[in-house]
Amino acid sequence: MVAVTLAGCGTTTYFAGRNLPPSGLVNRVMIAIQNPSAFSYGALEVVDAYYDTRFAYNNINQTFPVSGFSGDLPVTIQNMAEEQTGAVYNSGSGSLAMISYAKEAATGTQNGLNGDSSSIFITRDQEYIFAASQEEHVLTIVDRAKGGSYALSLPGIYRVSVNPGGTVALAFVQNSNYVYYPRQLTSSETLSYSGGPSTWPTSAVDCEPQNAPKWCLFQVADSNGTPLTFDRPLKAVFSTDGGTAYILNCGPECGGTASSASLLPTGPMIFRLGLASGALPSQSSMTNIPIPGGASNALVSSSTMYVVGQQPQTDGLYTGNLTVVNLANNTAGSPIGISDGSPGAPSRMILADDNTLWVAMTKCNNGERYAKGLPYGCLTMFNTSTNTVTLIEPYQGDATGIADVEGLHKIYAVEGGQVYIFSTKDGTAYDNQYVTVTGTAYDVAYIDAHSDSNNTVY
């Protein structure tokens, strides 16, 4: 990237008019680190992803910590590069810290969350936060624009998904076959539903506050109020036009029957005030794409959806698969073997240079590959032009983060609590000695990405 100084105002900018940050770096990867010292439980460090160093290229004593960050065991970075903002969830304190990429500084911690969150997202306009508060059995909604926080009861909730446009949120309950969505209420609905549960719509499972509700949580149901049945659903990804939600049915790897992807229109589930429209399908008319290789995570790219999951074997172990789905005709290809992983557990997926897709799994040493003496690393490099696996990287521990360093033909990855660098041309490992961290690395994000799609927390 080329930095440009604007004449007369002393401001230096680079890509898309972004101001040059205090570090002066234009290819930055931010690393979430747990227990970086005996006196700290968390830190965020910026490294130069062009030179692959944690210090300035001309001064080894100049490093780039994110100032003001005091998180406790950071585990995820929701990367919003277009907004020059990151949201870092800290599992030790149950807090969500907001990070300014332009200032390379923490800008505050979000209040109003209910205990720890097993899954949490903020909309890109930073107006709403949705969190699965599993221990408290509530879906927490923080309305940052209006200053309210709402706890909608949903026993067993453990995952939430939010669409890129920030208009639809879906909630999932562990070991359940149902899906839920929140919706903000109009003033007339608030009045109509203020008499308690007997005045709520048939598919509403909670409305809060009950004496004058502002939000209701609805079960996904047809126009007659009959709940739609899924198969251990745990996540949703969305079409590029935003009109369709692909519900991932985890199936056997989550204790269910058959893995698949179910298609729902997003219009009826829009949570923003007065924008919901249309109706959800009936059970018989809902499109369902069988994905026998497993379906616990997915990534949509134009008219293709890449789905990964774990498939049970006769010996009781699981093997990892990637399935390519053609969204133009809703057909799935044959499963392609990739890294094994923990059944139903979160995984990471990202597209990178040279037509590559990278998949990060955890507990890959407990799967079928390890048991049979096959390559069993947790990080898979997949070629999207040939739909083949290029390689499975050697085992270095759980893979918990990936970042695409756009245009430089490499990715950063976190494996076994340390940072590694791999070529997108052939998967070769680059020298990582100057980006390794003290403590336990847990996630990485390329914060100078061109778009918000360079993100594995979605």
Language-model segments: residues:
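Predominantly soluble domains enriched in secretory-pathway, periplasmic, or organellar proteins
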Residues: 9-458
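Sec-dependent bacterial lipoprotein signal peptides
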Residues: 1-9
